[in-house]
Amino acid sequence: MNYTDINAKTVDSWVQNGWEWGRPISHETFEKAKNGEWGVYLTPTKIVPHEWFGEMRGKKILGLASGGGQQIPVFTALGADCTVLDYSTEQLKREEEVGKREGYTPKCVRADMTKPLPFADESFDLIFNPVSNCYIEELEPVWREC
């Protein structure tokens, strides 16, 4: 088993034990986002300024290692066309739970971000990658893919 498989299993167990980054947003948070009241985190302590994103409606967004039902549902509520890629099965399940509850089908891809990404070049307008770089040995190949 390689280190990314071990990491995925570790994250799965954290999520099953109530890890804060594996707790999906509430219905109320989703509804607020639909009405323009929203915030997402890239790091644990500060909400990303809205102006970093620009207009979200119709924007194609990849949530890279962004499962958990926290950011991608917000972007979806804002009208973005979202795909989430994560190696944690439990994190992807949380995305699916939010989608089912809110009436949409999330595009979830289980893949290792240290490998070539399963998308054509320039498939996305924006890549959202919350803190996950600390779990991989070499960042350069990931950045080349992005």
Where do the protein language model's features map onto the residues?
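N-terminal, positively charged/glycine-rich alpha-helical extensions of SAM-dependent methyltransferases
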Residues: 1-31
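A short SAM/SAH-binding and catalytic strip from SAM-dependent methyltransferases
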Residues: 125-140
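A short acidic, Gly/Pro-enriched loop at the edge of an enzyme's catalytic core
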Residues: 114-126
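Class I SAM-dependent methyltransferase SAM/SAH-binding core
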Residues: 54, 59-116
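Conserved alpha-helix/loop element of class I SAM-dependent methyltransferases that forms part
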Residues: 24-59
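A short glycine-rich, Lys/Arg-flanked "PGG" loop and its adjoining helix->strand segment in the class I
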Residues: 140-146
